[in-house]
Amino acid sequence: MLETIKYSFVLPAYKAKYFREAIDSILNQTYADFELVIVNDASPEDLDSIVNSYDDKRIRYYKNEQNRGGKDLVAQWNHSIAYARGEYLILASDDDEYSPLYLERMDALVDKYPHVNVFRPRVKRINHKGKIVRIEGYQPEYLTKVEYLYAWTNLWIGSGIPFYVFKREALLAIGGFASYPLAWFSDDATVLRLMEPGIVTCNMTLFTFRLSTESISTTQNSKASLSAKLKATKMFCDEHNRIINDYIPQNEEDVLLLSLIKKFFPRMIRKNKVRSQLKISSLATIISTIGDSVKIDGVSLFYVLKCCKYPILNSLKSLVVPKR
């Protein structure tokens, strides 16, 4: 039986372009007690030669016989973490990078807050040319569930599966990463399910998130993709609202923050998810989706947009959908 260690970096791999840089950033950690589990998702690119160029006992390499991520990205994530043996998991990406101090600083916080399930660093975001487009602002080291949701609702902090450290036991207890269509909102939903004891942030910029134009969740521009993402949007809105409505305020500050979250949540969804997706979708795709009266688990496209208070698309409805 393999010995349990403290941390597992799990790297589902498909693209070769930044793959070596991603591996190097993990192996260059100043904290040494970790393994790197690489899962080749039946990539058509030559990942084998890149992995085989490393002589490092911390690497364990697996290959899927068939591609999983193209059909269900979250299923591939959950399949990949099954190979890990660490007490804490980091689901890495094949095009993002970690600072050498990432794990050392995360470990200090893990030891300081043993009851917490989710840890995150401050994040820098770059475009495909490597240019910095955003650096997150400072946050308190520890945030309660409602404090984090308030910060997230105001877009002060973002989400992204690769930069979190997850407590393995807690993650498996909720069935792994949240399964949403095209992994749309899967990162947010997973954190939401795990953060009852709060969330911890390191205010050092320890992770570089590459805003790739090649990911599954960003490249698809079709009616099916738009419908799937709108379905995921409704799923997340329902889950978020249910959790917020069930939350019992602990003090007057919680009461205020909850009221503000309820007020500004639709704006955040509209700005951060719906609008961004509509921006990359062609007008023909949008009109086709509307014209076919696409249903999302029995809920129309316009119901989702209405929940997000998206007036432009509500106006467009009258132009392209005949009255019945």
Model-derived segments and spans:
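Membrane-interface aromatic/basic loop that binds lipid-linked glycans or pyrophosphate carriers
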Residues: 1, 263-324
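Conserved nucleotide-sugar donor-binding catalytic segment
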Residues: 9, 143-228
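Short, well-formed alpha-helical segments that are part of the catalytic scaffolds
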Residues: 15-28
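Acidic donor-binding segment of Leloir-type glycosyltransferases
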Residues: 27-66
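Glycine-rich, basic loop-to-helix element that forms the pyrophosphate-binding segment
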Residues: 65-84
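Short aromatic/hydrophobic "clamp" motif used to bind/position activated sugar donors
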Residues: 89
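The conserved acidic donor/metal-binding loop of glycosyltransferases
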Residues: 93-97, 122
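Conserved donor NDP-sugar-binding/catalytic core segment of glycosyltransferases
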Residues: 101-135
